[in-house]
Amino acid sequence: MKKAILHTLIASTLALLSHQAFAAQDEVNLRMSWWGGNGRHQVTLKALEEFHKQHPNINVKAEYTGWDGHLSRLTTQIAGGTEPDVMQTNWNWLPIFSKDGTGFYNLFSVKEQLDLAQFDPKELQQTTVNGKLNGIPISVTARIFYFNDAIWAKAGLEYPKTWDELLAAGKVFKEKLGDQYYPVVLEHQDTLALIRSYMTQKYNIPTIDEANKKFAYSPEQWVEFFTMYKTMVDNHVMPSTKYYASFGKSNMYEMKPWINGEWAGTYMWNSTITKYSDNLTKPAKLVLGPYPMLPGAKDAGLFFKPAQMLSIGKSTKHPQESAMLINFLLNSKEGVEALGLERGVPLSATAVTQLRASGVIKDEDPSVAGLNMALELPHKMTTSPYFDDPQIVSLFGDAIQYIDYGQKTVQETAEYFNKQGDRILKRAMR
């Protein structure tokens, strides 16, 4: 009897020691990076806390910043093989970091840990390069119009349904409200996307010819592109870059003319609209506007893209655990509840079901309503990620400044942008 008890005690002790040794070996340390504002930081930290409760052997170190400097920091990390295990990434980074699909870990390899069935295959296709899934799109977003309801009412105008109505609104704002009032304010990246929409409606062709690694527009069409910009500025539809620059370099939604309603609308991602609306002087709020369409247009020319993605670093030593973390954030009850709509209306089917049931997703919410409207518009023509290349966007910003500061004519600017842009595209697509 004593021997049996002794054997049992020895076996139990060995099992306990074995379990402790296994637990110690099984401890995993992950790093996760993202950018955003304080609201995004807080909900993501809460979600990581919940993940650790369910997986106490997995520690996640959070590396979060604002937008400024985030890309350059990540570029250095990726080049040195020191990137985080899990990263919030942008869709237009795929051509920069992963031209052949090997720049990020292939998520098709961790299907056991990551429930890909919750995502529309069409959306996953956008983030797949050479058959390798480089990121899970968290949500999709589109640029659409939102207007300051109080200021537009004061101007006595209905929200523009056509391009002509948009162009005519500037004169009314100037005459009725004063020279400092504009129907919309657009930063250079917003302007680039808006005029592309107009050109797509008119010509039904893509902006970039990926097969030939250059722009698809003719020289005459580029002149028309920049003429449209100058027309909007001349018609007082939007402030020039020169006037805009006089208010400093802070975020547009933190500038005084935005807060007090002098800039009475924007063409913005539906997923980010809350922070723009929250900064308005109450009781003013942003409301969704119609989308201007040219007669007979077959495509709205919307800029649709994944709002952000979650990717796994190609250098990770823990791909399975990294995939578990992504799955928790996007598909689990606790992760979905913690993140809410901070990164837009989620693409995960189970997340949408949960958030609708809990009343978080409401069709009248400006962000949700904006996405629903965008999805109803004709939008078969996809946007090339090269259109959103940081160098192309920066080049456009320089180009319209040349016009606003009188340094180049529209014709000269069109030629300059076409020539320099083709060079950028050729290098980027090598």
Model-inferred region functions:
Residues 84-85, 114-151, 182-183, 298-302, ...:
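A structural signal for short loop-to-beta-strand junctions that line the ligand-binding cleft
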Residues 170-171, 214-246, 291-294:
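Glycine-centered hinge/linker elements that transmit conformational signals in sensory
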Residues 29-46, 65, 141, 384-388:
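Extracytoplasmic "Venus flytrap"
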Residues 134-138, 143, 167-222:
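Extracytoplasmic/periplasmic solute-binding protein
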Residues 91-143, 167, 285-289, 363, ...:
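Hinge/lid segment of periplasmic solute-binding proteins
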Residues 368-420:
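C-terminal capping/gating helix-and-loop segments adjacent to ligand/active sites or protein-protein/ligand interfaces
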Residues 26-37, 58-63, 85-86, 134, ...:
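Short, well-ordered beta-strand elements
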Residues 103-109, 271-278, 291, 308, ...:
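Mature extracytoplasmic/periplasmic domains
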